[in-house]
């Protein structure tokens, strides 16, 4: 069962867990855990995607309950009329607030995009970011005797593939758990000592104008146990009040590791 964050006669939003595909593709034909099919079975009607979240990213996923609703939502996303807010845990201390305007070359998958043009130039990519908190933990990583982490709020103004992950890597503050654009030593250390065994990127909030009622609509997604344990271990509880959960499974292993 997926957590339903919002539902009316036109729209439904769920809290997508990390590791779940939004929908099947021919590359993942045998995947059994898929958001769209699960939601369809859960609410008893078809759903229509309007946007996507990467498989390792968790958080708000908004869908239409008709093809028209899906189309209208997709149109709002394409025209950048929907405000998206994410939170991430990154390597190092990212403390400033700024806008990064750094064009990105399109990332092509060798199989899925084998017929796509490879000569496209960099595409505009803009992200507003704000450092919320920092911590230094007494755990050696690489040649450093301690490990530094930062909690960051992100608002992408464009929608390029892996934009937030690539922009933070460009800033030399990659997201913890990012196996493609991140720091592998930091990823291993975070997983071993603090239970950060996923991409620490969460789609916390969507704000939009309801396409049928015209009313403002804001949807928040709560954090999972991995996130809540990280906030506790790093002394960051209370910094994300709209997303933190009152109850969560407390860590039972050493150094914040979850027992299996």
Curated annotation (Swiss-Prot):
The lineage of its organism: Bacteria, Pseudomonadati, Pseudomonadota, Gammaproteobacteria, Enterobacterales. It is an enzyme of class 5 (isomerase). The active site is at 54. It catalyses: uridine(65) in tRNA = pseudouridine(65) in tRNA. It comes from the Bacteria. One of its GO terms (molecular function) is RNA binding. This is tRNA pseudouridine synthase C. SUPFAM superfamilies: Pseudouridine synthase. Belongs to the pseudouridine synthase RluA family. PANTHER family: MITOCHONDRIAL RNA PSEUDOURIDINE SYNTHASE, TRNA PSEUDOURIDINE SYNTHASE C. Its EC number is 5.4.99.26. Responsible for synthesis of pseudouridine from uracil-65 in transfer RNAs. One of its GO terms (biological process) is enzyme-directed rRNA pseudouridine synthesis. Keywords: Isomerase, tRNA processing.
């Amino acid at each position: 069962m997926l957590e339903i964050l919002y539902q009316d006669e036109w729209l439904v939003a769920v809290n997508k867990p990390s590791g779940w595909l939004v929908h099947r593709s021919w590359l993942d034909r045998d995947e059994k855990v898929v958001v769209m099919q699960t939601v369809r079975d859960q609410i008893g009607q078809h759903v229509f995607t309007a946007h996507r979240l990467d498989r390792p990213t968790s958080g708000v996923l908004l869908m239409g309950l008709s093809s028209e609703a899906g189309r209208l939502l997709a149109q709002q996303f394409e025209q950048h009329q929907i405000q998206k807010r994410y939170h991430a845990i990154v390597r190092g201390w990212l403390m400033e607030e700024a806008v990064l305007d750094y064009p990105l070359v399109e990332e092509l998958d060798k199989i899925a995009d084998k017929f796509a043009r490879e000569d496209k130039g960099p595409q505009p990519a803009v992200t507003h970011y704000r450092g919320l908190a920092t911590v230094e933990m007494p755990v050696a990583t690489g040649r450093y005797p301690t490990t530094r982490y930062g909690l960051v709020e992100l608002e992408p103004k464009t929608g390029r593939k892996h934009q937030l992950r690539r922009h933070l890597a460009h800033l030399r503050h990659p997201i913890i758990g990012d196996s493609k654009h991140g720091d592998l030593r930091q990823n291993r250390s975070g997983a071993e000592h603090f239970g950060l065994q996923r991409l620490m990127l969460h789609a916390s909030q969507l704000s939009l104008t309801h396409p049928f009622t015209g009313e403002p609509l804001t949807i928040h997604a709560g954090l999972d146990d991995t996130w809540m344990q990280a906030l506790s271990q790093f002394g960051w509880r209370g910094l994300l009040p709209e997303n933190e959960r009152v109850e969560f499974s407390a860590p039972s292993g050493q150094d914040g590791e979850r027992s299996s």
